[in-house]
Amino acid sequence: NQKLLILDSENILGTRIRQNRVVSTTVLIPEYASVLIPVFCSEQNRWSSSLSQEDIKVSESLYFSKGRENNFSDIYHSNSKQTNQHERWSEISDKLDEFKTKSFTSSVEEIYKKRKSNIEEIVRNFQPEKNQVGVALGIGSRLVSLDIFSSNEMFKIYLPRLIRSTALDSFKKTYYKS
C-alpha cells in the first residue's frame, strides 16, 4: 500500500514478455491502482514470450542518455506519451554498431553487459551526499541529465542507473558536441 514511481527510461526485462521494454514517460502509480504504462520495445528481433519461470525484472541501467533525450523530444513534439518505435530501434542498432556488439535480438541490454566493468568503474566514483536528492550529469561541457527526487532514499536507488545511462554515451567523445 504505497505509491510506485516508475522513471522514464526504465528497462523492463524478462522472458515472459515478448520483447524487453523501456518506459516512455515517468509514471507515479497510486496505491492499489491498475495503470497502462507507455513503453517502447528495446529489442527488435524477439517476438515470442517464453514459458520460462524467469520473472519480469527492472534492469540495473536506464536507457542510454542520448536515447532518453530523443525519446523525450518525440513525446514533447508529438504531444502524446508515445515515441517513434522505428527511431528507437534505429538508435539501438547504431549503438550496437558503435560498440561492435552482436545481439541476435538487437537488445540494448547487450551493450551494457559488454561494457559492464568500464561502467561500474565510473559508478563507483559517485557516492551520494547525506541529504542529496538530485544530480546534474554532463559529458564534456554538455548537460545531459538533470534529475531530482523526493527523498535521499529514492535518489540512492536511481543514482547508479542514471550514471550508467550517461556513462554509456560518454565513451564516444564526439556524441555530444558543445
Regions found by a protein language model. Name each.
Residues 131-178:
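Helix-biased "structured C-terminal domain" signature
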Residues 15-55:
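Intrinsically disordered, low-complexity Pro/Gly/Ser/Thr-rich segments with frequent PxxP/GP/PP motifs
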Residues 42-127, 135-137, 144-147:
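Terminal connector regions
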Residues 3, 33-34, 143:
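Short, solvent-exposed loop/turn motifs
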